Amino acid sequence: AFAGVLADADIKAALAGCAAAESFNYKTFFKACGLAGKFFAIIDQDHSGFIEEDELKLFLQTFSAGARALSDAETKDVDGDGMIGVDEFVALVKA
């Protein structure tokens, strides 16, 4: 999904920064990739206007099939409704 959008080196650096369990940090990841503005639409695989926790758990695998799935703790949304809207996502990556 990211072919031609991100440089392979940027993807590798971003994935390396969160290889260990419980180490994923949205701000660091998006900063390493350099394209926070385009990610919401890409992660929202079903184009519902929200990122569901299941979509977010498989987020790293969008970059590389061998990447780990994110844990429940790493994908918990702020308001607890199980979905991350655009405003919540922007706040999350800018936090």
Curated annotation (Swiss-Prot):
Which residues are Ca(2+) 2-binding?
A: D77, D79, D81, M83, E88
Q: Looking at the keywords, is Repeat present?
A: yes
Q: Which UniProt keywords apply?
A: Acetylation, Allergen, Calcium, Metal-binding, Muscle protein, Repeat
Where is it found, in Gene Ontology cellular component terms?
Answer: cytoplasm
Q: Taking every annotated instance into account, which residue ranges of this chain make up the domain EF-hand?
A: 39-66, 77-95
List modified residues, type N-acetylalanine: A1
Q: Which GO terms describe its molecular function?
A: calcium ion binding
What PROSITE patterns is this protein classified in?
Answer: EF_HAND_1, EF_HAND_2
State whether keyword Zinc applies: no
Anything else known: Is regarded as an important allergen. On the 2D-gel the determined pI of this protein is: 3.79, its MW is: 11.32 kDa.
Which purpose does this protein serve, as stated in its record? In muscle, parvalbumin is thought to be involved in relaxation after contraction. It binds two calcium ions.
Recorded family membership: Belongs to the parvalbumin family.
Q: What is this protein called?
A: Parvalbumin beta 3
Annotated source species: Merluccius paradoxus (Deep-water Cape hake)
